[in-house]
């Protein structure tokens, strides 16, 4: 990451990604965009047991949607499901325990889900940031396994289910941190470079943006989007970035503020009217590059990413 890119991004973050940035942006929101009732619509939210995923799942439930929570750990997931049911009065909240860094588990879940359920909206919210290089049981670098390969398998596996329904959507929670990274397909699992968990996470988030753009091109019947929730005060941030949280805690967005654009992309007709494949921040499509610091990738590089992911995905099927 260049010094220029780092400085520009950090200044942008302080201006736009904080609580005050949200409070400024929301002045332009259309209030009735989220005044919708959605009985019969089916949503799948990964990482829906805490943070902005849980906040999004709760708001969907309050509006009558059926919600499938895909979570890793049984006990906190059960607690979250119970809380969502109590607060929303909606019983149509279902729980699936899946480790999204385990491709074999994801494939098994996808095959079972396809047989038993319909789906209108997939929300790839779950994320992983480990700060020391760890390998999964399958020998995959953990951040890459959960943030990139896991998202790839889950999304491509569920595309046939989504394509059967009216107004299908896929929302992937990326991060503004991806602005400091250019797509790098030469070391996807951090085998040849010093490991920096924050930068690996940012690279994964760049990969998600590229995948979203490519899926939008290949599957025009589905509305794809990626988004940045801003800097939100969530359990994940507190655990993965304790220093950052300690420094900026009082300036961070609430979980509801961080979830707002995710919810807007999932529910509003205004979001569906936007071109597919875009990257959103505070209900607006924004550039995927910093000014004077483009991180664009070639079609060949993007195709290489997809080829590697597809080969890995099939290995574990």
UniProtKB/Swiss-Prot annotation:
Catalytic residues (UniProt): 201 (proton acceptor)
CDD domains (alphabetical): DHRS-12_like_SDR_c-like (cd09808)
E.C. numbers: 1.1.-.-
EC main group: oxidoreductase
Top-rank lineage group of the source organism: Eukaryota
Residues reported to bind substrate: 175
Family annotation (InterPro entries): NAD(P)-bd_dom_sf, SDR_fam, SDR_member_12
Swiss-Prot/TrEMBL keywords: NAD, NADP, Oxidoreductase
Function: Putative oxidoreductase.
Family the UniProt entry places it in: Belongs to the short-chain dehydrogenases/reductases (SDR) family.
Name this polypeptide is given: Dehydrogenase/reductase SDR family member 12
């Amino acid at each position: 990451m260049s010094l220029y890119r780092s400085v520009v991004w950090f200044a942008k973050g302080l201006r736009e990604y904080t609580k005050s940035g949200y409070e400024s942006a929301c002045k332009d929101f259309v209030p009735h965009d989220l005044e919708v009732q959605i009985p019969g619509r089916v949503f799948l939210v990964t990482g829906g047991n805490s943070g902005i995923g849980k906040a999004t799942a709760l708001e969907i439930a309050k509006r009558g949607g059926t919600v499938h929570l895909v979570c890793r750990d049984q006990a906190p997931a059960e607690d979250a499901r119970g809380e969502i049911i109590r607060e929303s009065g909606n019983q149509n909240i279902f729980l699936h325990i899946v480790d999204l860094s385990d491709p074999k588990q994801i494939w098994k879940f996808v095959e079972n889900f396809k047989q038993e359920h319909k789906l209108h909206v997939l929300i790839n919210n779950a994320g992983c940031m480990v700060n020391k290089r760890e390998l999964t049981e399958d020998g995959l670098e953990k951040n890459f396994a959960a943030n990139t390969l896991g998202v790839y398998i889950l999304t491509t596996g569920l595309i046939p289910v989504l394509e059967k329904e009216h107004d299908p959507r896929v929302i992937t929670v990326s991060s503004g941190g991806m602005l400091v990274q250019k797509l790098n397909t030469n070391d996807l699992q951090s085998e040849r470079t010093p490991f920096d968990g924050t930068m690996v996470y940012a690279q994964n988030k760049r990969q998600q943006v590229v995948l979203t753009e490519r899926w939008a091109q290949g599957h025009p019947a589905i509305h794809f989007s990626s988004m940045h929730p801003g800097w939100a005060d969530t359990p994940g941030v507190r655990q993965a970035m304790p220093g950052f949280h300690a420094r900026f805690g009082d300036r961070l967005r609430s979980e509801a503020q961080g979830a707002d654009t995710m919810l807007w992309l999932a529910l509003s007709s205004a979001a569906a009217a936007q071109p597919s494949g875009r990257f959103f921040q505070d209900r607006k499509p924004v550039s995927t590059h910093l000014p004077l610091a483009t991180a664009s990738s070639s079609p060949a590089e993007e195709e290489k990413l997809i080829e590697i992911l597809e080969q890995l995905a099939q290995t574990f099927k």
